C-alpha cells in the first residue's frame, strides 16, 4: 500500500479550513483594518465602538478591500485563508441589534409569534 503523501493532506486541510471563519479571525481582521487605517492616516471614526454609527467606516473599508484580505492560520502547517468568501457572514456579524425591543421584533418576524407565546 502506498504511503499517504503529507502534501496532499496539507492541501485538503487548507481547502476545508476555508469554509469556516472563527470569531478570533474576525477580531484579527478588525484590528488589522484599524491599524492599516491609522498607518495611512485615515483616522475618521477609527476609535468608534462596534455599536457606534461611526464603526460603519471600518465595515466600508473591509468591503472595499475584502478581495485582498488574508488571514494566516494554522500551527505547524501555516497557510492563508481568503476572506472574500465570508463577506456575508462578516456583514451579518456586524449588523447588530442595539435594543432588546428590536431584537424581539426581528425574532418574531423570523420565527413567528407562536414560538414566543407560552400560553399556548
UniProtKB/Swiss-Prot annotation:
<dbReference type="GO" id="GO:0019058">
    <property type="term" value="P:viral life cycle"/>
</dbReference>
<keyword id="KW-0805">Transcription regulation</keyword>
<comment type="similarity">
    <text>Belongs to the baculoviridae LEF-11 family.</text>
</comment>
<dbReference type="GO" id="GO:0006355">
    <property type="term" value="P:regulation of DNA-templated transcription"/>
</dbReference>
<dbReference type="InterPro" id="IPR009429">
    <property type="entry name" value="Baculo_LEF-11"/>
</dbReference>
<keyword id="KW-0804">Transcription</keyword>
<comment type="function">
    <text>Involved in late/very late gene activation.</text>
</comment>
<dbReference type="Pfam" id="PF06385">
    <property type="entry name" value="Baculo_LEF-11"/>
</dbReference>
<protein>
    <recommendedName>
        <fullName>Late expression factor 11</fullName>
    </recommendedName>
</protein>
